[in-house]
Amino acid sequence: ALRSALSALPVNQNRVVPDCEVRLTAGTNPQIVEAALDVTQGKLAMGFRTGGVTCWEEDYPAMVLCNAVFGGTTLSKLFMNVREKLSLCYYASSVLEKMKGLVLVSSGIEFDKYETARDEILAQLDQIRQGEIEDWELEGARRTVIGGYRATLDDQGRQEEFWLGQSAAGLEEDIPALCTQLETVTKEQVAQAAQKLQLDTIYFLKGKEGQHE
């Protein structure tokens, strides 16, 4: 029925799909990009390669929880420590791109706190690498991620988005199966996932020269 309903729509047969090469590992030295605009708040973004861990890999659930502990929830190290405790950022969070193997950190900072904020973000990641994860941090991350998946079951739009992503990736796991995988991830596995993260790029948006100095 769906094919029949869509059959009358015009289709462009001359579709060109550009070549795309996905790098799963970072270069020897991180790229550092700085830009200056007429802005009142600095932006610090940091991109990490997952060392080959994508949604097709067995250790992907551990990387999901690693990202959640790092900066993916309001109980994360970036939010609780870099933002709340140390007040180095107006906001700080991280997201995991499951198909390209990326963890992207985004934060808003004062211009003169660039180096301090950058170093502290890396220090928080090092804590995870060393297994310095409190039980409440891991369980809070686990409950938040699983709760987000389960909430999808009550929303048709989110279910459509979920299954579109699974179909594009060629994956068949449903939400209950993913939740079961997340339930068994240990603190040691999260630390091992963090050890695979490689800093690839740092981007700093600052004010123009002389602004707010």
Regions found by a protein language model. Give the residues of each.
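An aromatic/glycine/proline-enriched structural segment found at the starts
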Residues: 1-54, 211-213
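A generic short-segment signal for beta-strand/edge and adjacent turn/coil regions
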Residues: 11-18, 35, 59-61, 71-77, ...
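Signal/transit-peptide handling
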Residues: 37-124
